[in-house]
């Protein structure tokens, strides 16, 4: 948008799109909280598994990933957060976020021990049938699961 401004082009639409993107992590966490409420669980002290922390599917680039903001908000709400990402094995402290996590295996135990899973990045390597079978609650930000399932909430 800075280049468009340089030439006097109105960038309001670009700026609005950026604002919407920046507010998505809060929207996802709000939907997670509401879904947990329906299941008579609270966000506070829940166990949440984040699926995918890369910026886009099938890459290891985490720059601008919404997962970091989601994790940060969850941490502030006393949530026990874990993540699984086949492309990002470790989260390191950065200038913006103080997150130190190692990726966990995507398996029956980790899925069933979580109060909810939040699909942030839809990597092809994820076993979506396994996720569907063993997750108690799924917050689907990518439209990978049927919304007809009672445990799936689109965000």
Descriptions of predicted regions:
Residues 1-155:
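Structural/interface elements that position substrates and couple domains in central-metabolism enzymes
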């Amino acid at each position: 948008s800075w280049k468009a401004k340089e030439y006097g082009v109105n960038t309001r639409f670009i700026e609005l799109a950026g604002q919407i993107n920046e507010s998505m992590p809060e929207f996802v966490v709000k939907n997670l909280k509401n879904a947990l409420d329906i299941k008579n669980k609270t966000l506070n002290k829940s166990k949440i598994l984040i699926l995918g922390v890369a910026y886009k599917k099938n890459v290891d680039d985490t720059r601008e990933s919404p997962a970091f903001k989601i994790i940060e908000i969850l941490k502030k709400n006393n949530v026990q957060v874990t993540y699984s990402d086949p492309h990002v094995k470790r989260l390191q402290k950065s200038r913006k976020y103080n997150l130190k996590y190692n990726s966990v295996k995507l398996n029956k135990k980790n899925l069933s021990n979580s109060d909810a899973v939040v699909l942030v990045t839809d990597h092809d390597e994820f076993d979506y049938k396994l996720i569907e079978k063993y997750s108690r609650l799924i917050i689907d930000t990518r439209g990978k699961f049927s919304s007809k399932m009672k445990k799936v909430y689109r965000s």
